Amino acid sequence: MSTTINRNEKTKQVVNKTKEIKTESSQQQQQKPPISKLMGIILATRPWSLTISVTSVLVGSALAFREIREFDSIMLSIILVGAVSLQALGNVVNSFYDCKNGNDTKEKSADRTMFDFGLTEGNIINLIWYLLIQCAICLGLMIFRMDNIKCIVENILPLGAFGFILNISYTAAPIGLKYIGLGDLTIFLCFGPILVQSAFISQTHYHDSLAYFYSIPLALTIVAVLHVNNTRDIKADTEAGSITLASKLGFKNCYYIYAGLYLFAYIYLFKLSLDIDKYILNLPLILIPKIISLINQFKNKKLEDLTEKTGQLSFFFGGLNAIGVLLSMQ
C-alpha cells in the first residue's frame, strides 16, 4: 500500500514539474527579446511602406526620360532620399499623434511604434527633427542641382510646400485631415500628382500636366494601402471619435471600394495606353491574379497582414508602370 502511495506521489511530482517547465517555456515565448534603439528607430519609420514614395519617383522620372531623352542620376538620388525621408517623417508624426489623440493604445493598436520599440517620447521627437532636417537638406541640394530660379520658385517650392503641409497635417494639429475623413484624398495627392510631378520637374526643369495624368493609376493603388489600414482600424477610430472614410462606409462598402480602386487604376491605365497607342503601358496587368487574391483576403476579413501585402502590390505595380512608360517611347 505504501509503495503505491509513493508511486502516486512521484507521478504527481513528475506531472507538476512538467507543467512548471511548460509554463516557464510559454512565458519565455511570450516575452519578446528587447529591440535595440537603432532597430526601434528603423521600425518607427515603417520601412515596409517606404517603397510607396520610391515608385512615385520612378514613375515621374521614367515619364521625364520618355519626354526629353535625358537623365540626371544625381538628381534622382536626391529626390529619392528626399521623398523617402518625407514619407518616413509623415509615418512617425502619424504614429505620434495617433497615440496623443487616443486612436492608438497599447492594448489595441496595430501600430506599435509608441509602445514596443523601446523609444521614449523624446526619442520620437528627436527622430522627427532629424527627418525634418534631412528633408530640408535634400530640398537644398535639389535647388542647387537644378540652378533654374524660375522653375524653382514657380514649381518646386509650391509643390514641396503643399506636399509637406498635407503630409504633416494628415494627423498633426490643428487640422488632422485623417480624423475628418480626408485621409484618403491626402494620400492620393501626396504620393500621386505631387510626388510624380516633382520627380518629373526635377529631371525636365518644367511643369507638365501629363505627369498628373500618369500619376493616377499608381496613386489609386497607394490609396488602397491606406484604405485597408483604416478598415482594420474602424472600431478603434470610432471609439476615439475619429471620422475616416472607412468608418463612415462600413466593412461591406469598404470591400467594394478596395476592389474598385484597382478596377479604376487599370481602366485609367488602359485609357492612357489608348491615347498614345502604346499597349505596353498595361504591363501591370500581370499582377491581376495577385490582386484577386488580395481582394478575396479582404472579403474574408483577414486584414492582419493585408496592409503590408497591399503595399508590396503597389510597389510592383509602380515598378511595372515605370517600365511600361520607358518602353512606350516613340
Swiss-Prot record:
Query: GO:BP terms for this protein?
Result: menaquinone biosynthetic process; vitamin K biosynthetic process
Q: Where in the cell is it found?
A: Endoplasmic reticulum membrane; Golgi apparatus membrane
Q: Where is the signal peptide?
A: none
Keywords of the record: Endoplasmic reticulum, Golgi apparatus, Membrane, Menaquinone biosynthesis, Prenyltransferase, Transferase, Transmembrane, Transmembrane helix
Gene Ontology cellular-component terms for this entry are:
endoplasmic reticulum membrane; Golgi membrane
Q: Which family does it belong to?
A: Belongs to the UbiA prenyltransferase family.
Look up keyword Transferase and say if it applies: yes
Name the reaction it catalyses.
Answer: menadiol + (2E,6E,10E)-geranylgeranyl diphosphate = menaquinol-4 + diphosphate
Q: Which CDD domains match?
A: PT_UbiA_UBIAD1
- Gene that this sequence comes from: ubiad1
Q: Where are the transmembrane segments?
A: 39-59, 73-93, 124-144, 156-176, 180-200, 209-229, 254-274, 276-296, 310-330
Function description: Prenyltransferase that mediates the formation of menaquinone-4 (MK-4), a vitamin K2 isoform.
Task: Tell me which EC number(s) this protein carries.
Answer: 2.5.1.-
GO terms of molecular function: prenyltransferase activity
Q: Which domain of life is it from?
A: Eukaryota
According to UniProt, the name of this protein is UbiA prenyltransferase domain-containing protein 1
**Record pathway:** Quinol/quinone metabolism; menaquinone biosynthesis
- Do you know which Pfam families this protein is assigned to? UbiA
Instruction: Give the species this sequence originates from.
Output: Dictyostelium discoideum (Social amoeba)
